[in-house]
Amino acid sequence: MHDLPPDSGARRGGRGLADHSFPAGARAPGQPPSRGAAYRRACPRDGERGGGGRPRQQVSPPRSPQREPRGGQLRTPRMRPSCSRSLESLRVGAKPPPFQRWPSDSWIRCGAHRDWDEPPPRGGRMDGWSGDRARAAAPTGLQPPGCKDHGCSSGSPFRDPAGSSVIRSGKGDRQEGPSFLRPPAVTVKKLQKWMYKGRLLSLGMKGRARGTAPKVTGTQAASPNVGALKVRENRVLSVPPDQRITLTDLFENAYGSSMKGRELEELKDNIEFRGHKPLNSITVSKKRNWLYQSTLRPLNLEEENKKCQDRSHLSISPVSLPKHQLSQSFLKSSKEYCTYVVCNATNSSLSKNCALDFNEENDADDEGEIWYNPIPEDDDLGISSALSFGEADSAVLKLPAVNLSMLSGSDLMKAERHTEDSLCSSEHAGDIQTTRSNGMNPIHPAHSTEFVQQYKQKLGHKTQEGIMVEDSPMLKSPFAGSGILAATNSTELGIMEPSSPNPSPVKKGSSINWSLPDKIKSPRTVRKLSMKMKKLPEFSRKLSVKGTLNYINSPDNTPSLSKYNCREVHHTDILPSGNTTTAAKRNVISRYHLDTSVSSQQSYQKKNSMSSKYSCKGGYLSDGDSPELTTKASKHGSENKFGKGKEIISNSCSKNEIDIDAFRHYSFSDQPKCSQYISGLMSVHFYGAEDLKPPRIDSKDVFCAIQVDSVNKARTALLTCRTTFLDMDHTFNIEIENAQHLKLVVFSWEPTPRKNRVCCHGTVVLPTLFRVTKTHQLAVKLEPRGLIYVKVTLMEQWENSLHGLDINQEPIIFGVDIQKVVEKENIGLMVPLLIQKCIMEIEKRGCQVVGLYRLCGSAAVKKELREAFERDSKAVGLCENQYPDINVITGVLKDYLRELPSPLITKQLYEAVLDAMAKSPLKMSSNGCENDPGDSKYTVDLLDCLPEIEKATLKMLLDHLKLVASYHEVNKMTCQNLAVCFGPVLLSQRQEPSTHNNRVFTDSEELASALDFKKHIEVLHYLLQLWPVQRLTVKKSTDNLFPEQKSSLNYLRQKKERPHMLNLSGTDSSGVLRPRQNRLDSPLSNRYAGDWSSCGENYFLNTKENLNDVDYDDVPSEDRKIGENYSKMDGPEVMIEQPIPMSKECTFQTYLTMQTVESTVDRKNNLKDLQESIDTLIGNLERELNKNKLNMSF
C-alpha cells in the first residue's frame, strides 16, 4: 500500500488526493470513466499500478489471505494531517499517477454519468447519491482499464474543490452497474493551510519507511455478499520523511494478522491534537436523538438509501453508540469490513439543507452548552443497517478512534480538515466518503479485537506533551482547530446515526467556551447516565491506563468487541489523570460522576502539585440529585480504590494520605510537671484518629471535644467510625486564658441509654509545648487506647490576665507543702486559709445539699476560684452572690487536698488506724455506731503522731466531715459516702519526680497501699465513725478572725433530734409534703459518684405504701397552728401579716407573705419555725404546680 503524504487529496478534500495520486489525464488501469467512489466497486482492476511517471512509494498493506485470487493488495488511502508548511511549494504535475481502485469497489453503487469536476447539487440531495443513481447496476465483471467516462480524462476524481463524496456499500442484493460518485476535492492551498494549523506531526511520524509496493497482479473476484471493501492506493508526493504521513497510518485493516504496532501508534498520533477545543459533543438531546432514530432505522438498505436522499441531518456519533450497535457484528468476514471514510472539502453550498451533527454541540444550548464523555446506553434497540451521510454544517469533523464503530468495516481512515473561511461562514460541507459492505453479515471477532487491543495499548502509553488525548473522541470546534473523521474498526455495528431532525443552527460568531465546563444545567441527567456506567466495573474505576491495559491484554478479549472494550478504549483517550493536564481541564464527566473515586476537575491540578490535607471530611455532600463535585477519596483512593464505596475510600485511605511521619508522638505521661500558664489565640486542627474502637465493633458514632483546663471549648459533629482510622478535617480557633492543659476527649454516643460515654482522652501541656515553637503536629496518645493526629498552633500570645501570675511564676497555694502555705500566710492559725474559708462557707449553706462533695461544680468557675486563691487567699470571698454553687467550693477544697505533696493521713497514721481497727472494730447497728466513748477518745489521740500543722488541719477537716454526716438524712452523705469521696484524697501516696509526673513508689508496700483504695476508705470511715461531734468549733474559731461575717454564722442551726418513726396521728395526712418523684437538686450526670447503696432503692420512689418508712426532715404539718408564733416581731422594719389557716388549697398570697420573713425575727424562738415554714411553702408550691390546681391571687 502506498503511503499517502499529508498533502494528499484524500486528506483535505481539495484536489490534492487526485492530483497526488494520478498523473494528469491518467486514471487507474481498472478505473472506469465514471465519477463516484461507488464505481470503484463496479470497476474492474486488472492491475493496481500508477499510470504516471512519478514513482510511487509503497508499503505492504494488510492482506486478506482468503481472497487474493488476483494478487491484489488491500491498499487503503490514508489521510493524515501534518503541521508542516514545507509542502506549500509543492505543486502537482500535469499528469499525476493514476488513482488505484479496488476490485471490491464495484459493489458500491453511485450515480452514473457525472463528471468528476461537476459540483454536486445544492438542493438538499446529491445527484450522485440519488435513488435512481443508487439503483444503477454495476457490472460484476471487471471493465478494462481503458474505459472512460465523463471527467475521467480530465484528471483526478477528487479535483472538485468544493465537493466531497461518500463511498457507501449497500446490501448484496442490489443491482450492479456503472455508478459514479463525486470525489472529494482538496486544493493544495487549503491543504497547506490545514497542515499549518493542524500541528499533528509527532515523533512517530518521522521515521516512516519508503518502500515500493508490489504491483497487483491478477484479478480478484468481487462478490456482493462477501467481497471486502478495498480502497485503491494513491500516489504519494515526494516529501521529506519528517513531514510524511503515511496512508496506512490512517487506514487499518481489521484483519488482525496485518495490524502492526507501528501503524497503531501512528494512528494514535494522528488522533491526538494540541491546543484545540472539541467541536462536536455528546449532549443529552443528542443521545435522545440517537436512541429515537436508531429505533426507526430500517433494516432494508433500499429503504435507507431512499431515506438518505431526504435526510437533512446525519449524525456521526463521536462517541459510543447504543448497546445494539455495540453488541452486533456488521460484516461477515475479515475482508468485508474495510472502511473508507474521507472527510474533506468545505462546500458552503452543501450545508444549507444537510447539516451534519458535527456542529451539533449547538444542540447543547438547551442543556447549558455542555458536552459529556461518552456514556454507552443499556437500551437494547433495533439494529440499524443503513449508513447514511449527508452534507454538514460543520467545518471540521473528528470522531473517536476505537471507541465506536462508525462504519461496519474494520479498516480505519480518518481525514481532518480546517475550514478556510471558518470565521466568516458557518456553512461548511463535510461530504463523507464511506464504504460499507454487506449489511448484517457478522464480523470475525478476532480481527477487529486484535486491532482494538493494539490500538488501546498504543493509546495507553502515549503521553506526549502537547497531545490532546481527550480530543480524539470529540469533534473539533469549527473555529478553533482541526478535527478528524474517524471510522473505527470494531466488531460492533458501526454506523452513522442520523441526528435530531431539528438541530440547533450553527452559531457563526460564537463557539462554546469549553474552558468553563461548569455551565451544566442537567446534573440529574448526568447522574442518571453515570449510574448506568457504574454497572461496568471497568468504567467506574475511572478507566485508568492500568485498568485498560490489564483488560486488553487478557486472553478473554478475543471475542467481539463489547461495550466494555469500547468504553475502556474511549476513556483511555480522555483519562483524567496526570498524563494530560489539558485533557483533564475539559473532562466534564469526571466532575459530574457519582463515582467518588474520580478526582474533581478543579482540584485536580492542585492535588498534583501538592498533597491534599484531607480527603473526605464531611466535605461536600450530595443532595441526592446533583453529583458530588469533590472527591471523597485521597490520591491513594483514586488510584487503588476504584469503584468502591465512599465509606471504604474515605475511611481506609485517609491514613495513607496524611504524612504520619510528620506528626510527633506525644504522651502526657512523658511530660514534666508544669506550673506555668499561657494565654492567647490557639488553632486546633484535627486530621484523624486511629484505633478508637475495638475491632469487634462494626461501627461507632463518636465526636471529639476540646477542653482547656477541663472546660469544654468546642466539639466536632457526630462522626461514624467504621474502620480503624477515623478521617477528620476540623479546625477550631480557641481563646485561652491562663491555660495549662489542652484535653482532647473522644466521646462515643450510646443510642440505647441515649448518653455520651468517654471513649478515650489525651492531654497536651500548652505552656511547655509553645515555649519555643508556635506550631506543632502531634500524634497525641489517647488513654486507654488510640492516637489522634492534630495540629496545634498558637496564632497569638497574650499576657496573662492574672496580675500576680506570671508565666514563670510558681504556684503558692495548690501543690505547695501545707507548712509553707501556713507560714507564708502568717495569720496566727495552723490551718491554711483556703481550708478555713471553704469549710466555713460549706457549713454555712451547704450541709443540707443533697450529694455534697459528690457532685461536680463548674470547671470554669473552679478554675477562677483557684486563680483567686493563688493571687491572694486573704482577699477571697466566698459569698453566695459570687459563688452560688456550693459544689464549686467543695470541688476546690478536694482539689487542694488532692494536690498536696504529702497526704494529710500519713503512712504512720494510716498504719496506726489499721491497728486500732484490728483492736477495736466498729460496732454498727441500726441506731448507728455503738462503740464505747473511750474508742472515740483513742481515735482522736491517734492524730498525735502528725506534725502540728497537719494535725490541726486534719482535725478541722474531720470535724467538718462529721458535721456534714450528721445531716445525712437530708444530704444523703453518710460517713461511708464521705469516706468514699475523701479516702483516695486524704490517703494518696503520690510522689512526683522532677522529670515525670507518673506515680512512682519507693517500695512494694507503698505501692500496695496506694492501690488499695478499699483500705483507704475503711480507714477514713473508721475515723469518721468514732470522731466526736464538735459543732461550734468552726464558729468559735472564726468569730475573732472575721467579725464582719459573724452575722452570717447565725444561719447555722442545729437540727432537732429526728424521731425513729414519724407520728402522723395528729396531722392531716393530705397536707403532708410528699417528695416528688425524680426530684433532684442536681443534674443526673452528677449523681453517680461513689457509693449510693445506703440510700436504698426507694429513695426517689416514695409511694403511699412506704410512707411510714420515709424520713422527713422538719416537715411541719399544714394545720392552723403554723402561723401562731409569727405574731410578734423584734423590729418594725418588716410587717408580717397573720396568715390564715392554710389548707390543701392555700393561696399564693399566703406564700408570698411568708417569704417576707427576715432575720429580724427573734432568732432563738422563730428562726427554726421560719425555716420550717419556708420548706412548707416550697413543698406546697411544688405539689400544687404538679396538680395544675394553683390558684394565684396577687
Curated annotation (Swiss-Prot):
Record-annotated Rho-GAP domain positions: 816-1031
GO terms under cellular component: cytosol; synaptic membrane
Domain of life of the native organism: Eukaryota
SMART domains hit by this protein: RhoGAP (SM00324)
Site (Arginine finger): R854
Keyword Phosphoprotein: yes
PROSITE patterns: C2, RHOGAP
InterPro entries linked to this entry: C2_dom, C2_domain_sf, Rho-GAP_regulator, Rho_GTPase_activation_prot, RhoGAP_dom
Gene3D superfamilies associated with the record: C2 domain, Rho GTPase activation protein
All copies of domain C2, residue ranges: 660-779
Protein's UniProt keywords contain Phosphoprotein: yes
GO term, biological process aspect, one: cell migration
Region Disordered, annotated ranges: 1-106, 133-182, 1057-1080
Pfam families the record matches: C2_SYDE (PF25336), RhoGAP (PF00620)
Alphabetized UniProt keyword annotations: GTPase activation, Phosphoprotein
Job of this protein: GTPase activator for the Rho-type GTPases by converting them to an inactive GDP-bound state.
Protein name: Rho GTPase-activating protein SYDE2
Gene: SYDE2
